[in-house]
């Protein structure tokens, strides 16, 4: 259940974040690639002082149920999620997350209360959180309880505040749902919908590459979720198979928003210590701290190839240098002609890299040639120059998806793709339909179900 907590999600030293609704005018963006995406972000020095709100990892007087006092400043968003900043007696601002419990009798279990959930089993442990499978005493549903340990000296982990603040405002079938937030003196608990596995575990269970139809449905759902958050100017920043949850019916859900960032916030540079090395784009590996949604799209390309080929696209074994060499071996060593501006990146030293020519992707990953249009889509996602990468919205319109039912593009945000007739997963190699049980939606091939 790595997707619920993310072992590498500890906050970077000295890291600050800005939360809230964009206070800027957004221009129309290209739907073909990531070029021009950064133009919608105002530099920090152009934002009036009274519009700047900073959250730091400080000792917290965190109480999600306290009514706002007069000294509380509110940062609103269009979806009514908000983060409050209450000025303490020391003059520092400490983060507060507000939520409202539904009315109930004094003796019945309530949302927002620790005794409303029963822990069933431990699922895993990260650097600052432990995840349990649990059950709600309010409605009887299974949940995942992400229990974050609060350190008296450090206060509430910043990544937890970021994750909660973003997820409370995201409602989409392909994004893990945050049901509840519980705060006690010792812990902060995020209560998520329970999803039984992740893409990493799913691929480990089915080595050698997944069924092509299933790859297509998983990728479509990943792009749906990303398109939704990117349209809201949010970057995930930590895409990897462990952070993509898979339900027993085949629904894919983006999870672990601990490193996610609202890109509409007035900040041009972000930490480059994000994204597991295998899924980290070359611009970030080379020290770039100015990036946008194209950061996530590189990860999509890596995951796409891995689902088809059955092995990681760029499995670096040593360090950043080794990771870059593996990328350049396939895509070619960049220069100013193929990647304008690459020489200005902090860690790009041409003499350090072997000079490789680019090759067709099927030479590196032969199974791409077995699937119509897969190589073309992968090549448009795995572009060294970030501005050349396809956007999530454009990728959804790629010919690779042309044999899917048109109604998939008409679904509302909260509607699952499996509500469309004949859209269902296929048994993976060596599995029978019986192995999945009666609740799973396996059936005839997608190639025969366009409508």
Curated annotation (Swiss-Prot):
Quaternary context: Found in a complex with LRP6, CCNY and CAPRIN2 during G2/M stage; CAPRIN2 functions as a scaffold for the complex by binding to CCNY via its N terminus and to CDK14 via its C terminus. Interacts with CCNY; CCNY mediates its recruitment to the plasma membrane and promotes phosphorylation of LRP6. Interacts with CCDN3 and CDKN1A. Interacts with SEPT8. Interacts with 14-3-3 proteina YWHAB, YWHAE, YWHAH and YWHAQ.
The organism named in the record is Plecturocebus moloch
Chain sites annotated for binding ATP: 123-131, 146
Function of the molecule: Serine/threonine-protein kinase involved in the control of the eukaryotic cell cycle, whose activity is controlled by an associated cyclin. Acts as a cell-cycle regulator of Wnt signaling pathway during G2/M phase by mediating the phosphorylation of LRP6 at 'Ser-1490', leading to the activation of the Wnt signaling pathway. Acts as a regulator of cell cycle progression and cell proliferation via its interaction with CCDN3. Phosphorylates RB1 in vitro, however the relevance of such result remains to be confirmed in vivo.
Q: Ranges for the Protein kinase domain?
A: 117-401
Q: Give a Pfam family name.
A: Pkinase
Where does the record place the region Disordered? 84-114
The EC code for this enzyme is 2.7.11.22
- Protein name in UniProt: Cyclin-dependent kinase 14
Which Gene Ontology BP terms does the record give? Answer: cell division; G2/M transition of mitotic cell cycle; regulation of canonical Wnt signaling pathway; Wnt signaling pathway
Citing just one GO molecular function, the answer is: cyclin-dependent protein serine/threonine kinase activity
Going by the UniProt record, its keywords in alphabetical order are: ATP-binding, Cell cycle, Cell division, Cell membrane, Cytoplasm, Kinase, Membrane, Nucleotide-binding, Nucleus, Phosphoprotein, Serine/threonine-protein kinase, Transferase, Wnt signaling pathway
Under catalytic activity, the entry for this protein gives:
L-seryl-[protein] + ATP = O-phospho-L-seryl-[protein] + ADP + H(+); L-threonyl-[protein] + ATP = O-phospho-L-threonyl-[protein] + ADP + H(+)
């Amino acid at each position: 259940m790595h997707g619920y907590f993310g072992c590498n999600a500890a906050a970077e030293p000295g890291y600050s974040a800005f939360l809230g609704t964009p206070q800027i005018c957004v221009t129309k963006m290209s739907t073909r690639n990531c070029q021009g995406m950064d133009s919608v972000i105002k530099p920090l020095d152009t934002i009036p002082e009274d519009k700047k709100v900073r959250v730091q990892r400080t000792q917290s007087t965190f109480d999600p149920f306290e009514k706002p006092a007069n000294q509380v400043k509110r940062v609103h968003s269009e979806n009514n999620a908000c983060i409050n900043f209450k000025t303490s007696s020391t003059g520092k601002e400490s983060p507060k997350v507000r939520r409202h419990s539904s009315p109930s009798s004094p003796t019945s279990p309530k949302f927002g209360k620790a005794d409303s959930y029963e822990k069933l089993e431990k699922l895993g442990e990260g650097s600052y959180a432990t995840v349990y499978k649990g059950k709600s005493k309010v409605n009887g549903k299974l949940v995942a309880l992400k229990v974050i340990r609060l350190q008296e000296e450090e206060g509430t982990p910043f990544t937890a505040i970021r994750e909660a603040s973003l997820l409370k405002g995201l409602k989409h079938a392909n994004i893990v749902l945050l049901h509840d937030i519980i705060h006690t003196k010792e812990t902060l608990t995020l209560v998520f919908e329970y999803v039984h596995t992740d893409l990493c575990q799913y691929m480990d269970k089915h080595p050698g590459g997944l069924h092509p139809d299933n790859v297509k449905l998983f990728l479509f759902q990943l792009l749906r979720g990303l398109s939704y958050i990117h349209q809201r100017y949010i970057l995930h920043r930590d895409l990897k198979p462990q952070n993509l949850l898979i339900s027993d019916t085949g629904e894919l859900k983006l999870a672990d928003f601990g490193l996610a960032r609202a890109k509409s916030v007035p900040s041009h540079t972000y930490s480059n210590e994000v994204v597991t090395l295998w899924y980290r784009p070359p611009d970030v590996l080379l020290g770039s701290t100015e990036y946008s949604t194209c950061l996530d799209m590189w990860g999509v390309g890596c995951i796409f190839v891995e689902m088809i080929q059955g092995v990681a696209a760029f499995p670096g074994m040593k360090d950043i240098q080794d990771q870059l060499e593996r990328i350049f071996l396939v895509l070619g060593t960049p220069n100013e002609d193929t990647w304008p501006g690459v020489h200005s990146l902090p860690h790009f030293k041409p003499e350090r890299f072997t000079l490789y020519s680019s090759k067709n992707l099927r030479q590196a990953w032969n199974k791409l040639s077995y699937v119509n249009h897969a190589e073309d889509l992968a090549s448009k996602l795995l572009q060294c120059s970030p501005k050349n990468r396809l956007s999530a919205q454009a990728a959804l319109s790629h010919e690779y998806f042309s044999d899917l039912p048109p109604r998939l593009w008409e679904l509302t945000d909260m509607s699952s793709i499996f509500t469309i007739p004949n859209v269902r997963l296929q048994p993976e190699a060596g599995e029978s339909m019986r192995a999945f049980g009666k609740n799973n939606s396996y059936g005839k091939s997608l190639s025969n179900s366009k409508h």
